[in-house]
């Protein structure tokens, strides 16, 4: 928001300079983005009157004038401005004046005619970019008065960033309140006496959507001169706030908007059919806006309509049909309070952002409408003339926001600020902020002012007290904390340790959104129910993820589209699963997931290009699982997952509980997601693994190890992992290592069977094993395999 410093000082004028004022506003939480002078540096420019204006004898586009600047004689000045005319009050740079850019005015001759000064435009004085003509001053401007003094050009524009919670500061009065509070200075409330109705004309107003529009005020003003010029003082105030003057009626509503922060609108009363109806739009209803664009409305959009059609989008933009134009004689002034939720998002939907929508979305003072409509009526009558009717008030007190009553405890105040502020100061600060305060025993009950709807809870009052007291006035205190040794369980496995291992294996950690595309998620988890967001960032981010795969696979596609074909990434994060037994109906599980694709190794002259396969990912995952000490209890079982290849995937079980999946992405899913080549994924429920088994130290055997190899033939559907597990179980005291080193299918092995070559490492910690003992242990393993898997030794 941009405003004039002098306009602010009309409301409150603390005895501090511009720099101190800007710093004070920033420290109050309204960050000042810039302070700029409203005009360039110049002197010697005074008010003059064009007494004579004749055509230059030697130039078609020049005029020869005689100008009275209040001196002993008239000045001869040559001027080329098209609006120069006799009787016009102008800004005259006399001989010796210095204009912006260090341009000194001297006596000269232009096409043979003497010129003793310059009739200035706004651009020549560095006031604005308007160079279309010379400045036209009011007829009552006193001759010879310094133009800087007359136009009050020793002023600055201050631009501030207003945070969403401080919508009350989107008007001069709101900033003035804060400055008054900070300086303990009086706020000069402007006289806004009610305008007495001189006519009885009204217009029927019906509010059908009372929740969206709790208060709607209207007032008929008849017989106005819409072509009356806007006073220069008002134009200047608007300009210094970044608002262009349009016509007197629009300028008045903009002036009230900037001064009080209350948006207003003026309708051409004669174009309203029947009366005003505040209602929700009909689905697909259209309205042509003031800028000529056509908006197609949704049923959740609030509109101002007459008895037959929509006239404008409430709180956002007026309509062209009922807009004020050069022929307007009678207007209806509108001043309303709209519920912020009924306005939020509607402007963006139509590609609009107006000063009105900016304020209504954040909220305006629900008690301000009477003051604003009286102020606008008085200004309109003073400028355009006419007669005003009575105020038409349609209010629903039940739906208007209520003032919050908040209890501030001394203990909470001291604890959060870390400094004791005297009771009298606290009470004084709250009252200066506009609160109605009742003092109690070590507490205050404060009723928030109507313009501060951001005051809702105790912490809000703590913030306000600290802000007004001054953050710089709170002494620095060194932080004191007791050094309490935290407890550490040996069984706790840090997720950071797992991440470090994956980093060491060439994986990169990524963080993806918890919001995913529901269509993509349905491809990965067909038929699964997901939590849908009522107000998503976009349609593609409207569902909460059921697994980390949605984000990871999208990341793979993103990288592949940028010629990064070798990808190794992992992520840890929450998934959100609807569960009626969980708190709030949503179960949140911490997951660990990873994806690999592309070549096994980076390109190298001494390495063959080999694409990653199931066992690459399984090996990396087993290394992670080994950190938990539970690898021996992990089983990979063939189990269907719609997102994975049925022949190259497995469910991961910890004892008898499934904790995740691993496998190659299903070819059909791969095609639909535009994945380039084989992609492998895994996902685990981390909390099932975080409590690791503490390793038990044991003596390393000093005796020699013995290796024996066996080849067993088993059915094709028997997992090799089960064979190895059985061998370990049978030879628990002596078999210290079991390894599968070959798988054979073909000649000598029947169809539907496979030959597994297994090495058994046997060793004892107390003695050297005899050959008979070794043979007996191997025989026990073979016998166990025959009994459980119908295995046979291969010849």
Curated annotation (Swiss-Prot):
EC number(s) per entry: 6.1.1.20
Show the GO cellular component annotation of the record: phenylalanine-tRNA ligase complex
Which residues belong to any copy of the FDX-ACB domain?
701-794
- InterPro entries reported for this sequence: aa-tRNA-synth_II/BPL/LPL, B3/B4_tRNA-bd, DNA-bd_dom_put_sf, Fdx_antiC-bd, Fdx_antiC-bd_sf, NA-bd_OB-fold, Phe-tRNA-ligase_IIc_bsu, Phe-tRNA-ligase_IIc_bsu_bact
Q: What class of enzyme is it?
A: ligase
Reaction it catalyzes: tRNA(Phe) + L-phenylalanine + ATP = L-phenylalanyl-tRNA(Phe) + AMP + diphosphate + H(+)
GO MF terms listed in the record are: ATP binding; magnesium ion binding; phenylalanine-tRNA ligase activity; tRNA binding
In this chain, Mg(2+) is annotated as bound at: 454, 460, 463-464
Could you tell me which residue ranges the tRNA-binding domain spans?
A: 39-148
GO BP field:
phenylalanyl-tRNA aminoacylation
Q: Where in the cell is it found?
A: Cytoplasm
Q: How is the cofactor bound?
A: Binds 2 magnesium ions per tetramer.
Q: What does this protein need as cofactor? A: Mg(2+)
Q: Which PROSITE patterns match?
A: B5, FDX_ACB, TRBD
Q: For this UniProt record, give its keywords in alphabetical order, as a comma-separated list.
A: Aminoacyl-tRNA synthetase, ATP-binding, Cytoplasm, Ligase, Magnesium, Metal-binding, Nucleotide-binding, Protein biosynthesis, RNA-binding, tRNA-binding
B5 domain residues: 401-476
Assembly and partners?
Tetramer of two alpha and two beta subunits.
Instruction: Identify its protein family.
Output: Belongs to the phenylalanyl-tRNA synthetase beta subunit family. Type 1 subfamily.
Xref: NCBIfam families: pheT_bact, YtpR
Name of the protein in its database record: Phenylalanine--tRNA ligase beta subunit
State the encoding gene.
pheT
């Amino acid at each position: 928001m941009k405003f004039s410093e002098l306009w602010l000082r009309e409301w409150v004028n603390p005895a501090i300079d511009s720099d101190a004022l800007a710093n004070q506003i920033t420290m109050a939480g309204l960050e000042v983005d810039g302070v700029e002078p409203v005009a360039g540096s110049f002197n010697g420019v005074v008010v003059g009157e064009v007494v004579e204006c004749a055509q230059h004898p030697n130039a078609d586009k020049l005029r020869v004038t005689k100008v009275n600047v209040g001196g002993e004689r008239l000045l001869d000045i040559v001027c080329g401005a098209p609006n120069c005319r006799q009787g016009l009050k102008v800004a005259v740079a006399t001989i010796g004046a210095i204009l912006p850019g260090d341009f000194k005015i001297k006596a000269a001759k232009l096409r043979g005619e003497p010129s003793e000064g310059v009739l200035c435009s706004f651009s020549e004085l560095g006031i604005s970019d308007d160079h279309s003509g010379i400045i036209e001053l009011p007829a009552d401007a006193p001759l010879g008065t310094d133009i800087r003094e007359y136009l009050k050009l020793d002023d600055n524009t201050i631009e501030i960033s207003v945070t969403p919670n401080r919508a009350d500061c989107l008007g001069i009065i709101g900033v003035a309140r804060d400055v008054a509070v900070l300086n303990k200075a009086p706020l000069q409330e402007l006289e806004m006496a009610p305008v007495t109705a001189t006519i009885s004309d009204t217009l029927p107003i019906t509010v059908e959507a009372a929740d969206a529009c709790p208060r709607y005020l209207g007032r008929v003003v008849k017989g106005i001169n819409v072509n009356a010029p806007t006073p220069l003082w008002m134009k200047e105030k608007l300009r210094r706030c970044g608002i262009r003057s349009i016509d007197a009626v629009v300028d008045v509503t903009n002036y009230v908007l900037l001064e009080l922060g209350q948006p207003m609108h003026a309708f051409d009363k004669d174009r309203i059919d029947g009366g005003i109806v505040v209602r929700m739009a009909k689905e697909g209803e259209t309205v042509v806006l003031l800028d000529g664009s056509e908006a197609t409305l949704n049923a959740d959009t609030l509109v101002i309509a007459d008895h037959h059609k929509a006239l404008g989008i409430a709180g956002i933009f007026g309509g062209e049909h009922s807009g004020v134009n050069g022929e307007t004689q009678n207007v209806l002034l509108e001043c309303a309070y709209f519920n912020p939720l009924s306005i939020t998002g509607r402007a963006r939907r139509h590609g609009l952002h107006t000063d009105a929508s900016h304020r209504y979305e954040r909220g305006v003072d629900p008690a301000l409408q009477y003051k604003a409509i009286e102020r606008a009526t008085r200004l309109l009558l003073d400028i355009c003339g006419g007669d005003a009717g009575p105020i038409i008030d349609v209010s629903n007190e039940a739906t208007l926001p209520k003032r919050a009553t908040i209890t501030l405890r001394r203990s909470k105040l001291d604890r959060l600020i870390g400094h004791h502020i005297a009771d009298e100061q606290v009470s004084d600060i709250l009252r200066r902020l506009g609160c109605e305060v009742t003092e109690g025993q070590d507490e205050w009950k404060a009723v928030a002012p109507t313009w501060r709807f951001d005051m809702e809870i105790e912490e809000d009052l703590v913030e306000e007290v600290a802000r007004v007291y001054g953050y710089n006035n709170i002494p620095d205190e060194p932080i004191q904390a007791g050094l309490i040794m935290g407890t550490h369980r040996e069984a706790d496995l840090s997720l950071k340790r797992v991440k470090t291992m994956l980093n060491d294996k060439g994986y990169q950690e990524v963080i993806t959104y918890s919001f995913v595309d529901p269509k993509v998620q349905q491809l990965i988890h067909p038929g699964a129910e997901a939590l849908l967001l009522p107000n998503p960032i976009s349609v593609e981010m409207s569902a909460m993820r059921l697994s980390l795969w949605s984000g990871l696979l999208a990341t793979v596609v993103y990288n592949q589209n940028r010629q990064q074909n070798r990808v190794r990434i992992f992520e840890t994060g929450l998934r959100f699963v609807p569960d009626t037994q969980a708190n709030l109906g949503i179960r949140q599980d911490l997951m660990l997931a990873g994806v690999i694709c592309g070549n096994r190794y980076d390109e190298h002259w001494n390495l063959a290009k080999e694409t990653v396969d199931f066992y690459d990912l399984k090996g990396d995952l087993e290394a992670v699982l080994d950190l938990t000490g539970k690898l021996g209890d992990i089983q990979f079982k063939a189990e269907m997952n719609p997102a994975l290849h049925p022949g190259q995937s497995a469910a991961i079980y910890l004892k008898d509980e499934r904790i995740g999946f691993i496998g190659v992405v299903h070819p059909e899913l791969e095609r639909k997601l535009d994945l380039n080549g084989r992609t492998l994924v895994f996902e685990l429920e981390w909390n099932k693994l975080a409590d690791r088994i503490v390793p038990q130290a044991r003596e390393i055997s000093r005796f020699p190890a013995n290796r024996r190899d066996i080849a067993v033939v088993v059915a094709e559907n028997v997992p090799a992992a089960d064979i190895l597990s059985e061998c370990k179980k049978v030879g628990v005291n002596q078999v210290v290592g079991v390894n599968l080193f070959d798988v054979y299918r073909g000649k000598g092995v029947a169809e539907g069977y496979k030959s597994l070559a297994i090495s058994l490492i046997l060793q004892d910690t107390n003695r050297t094993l005899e050959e008979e003992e070794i043979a007996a242990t191997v025989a026990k393993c073979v016998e166990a395999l025959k009994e459980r898997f119908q295995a046979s030794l291969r010849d």
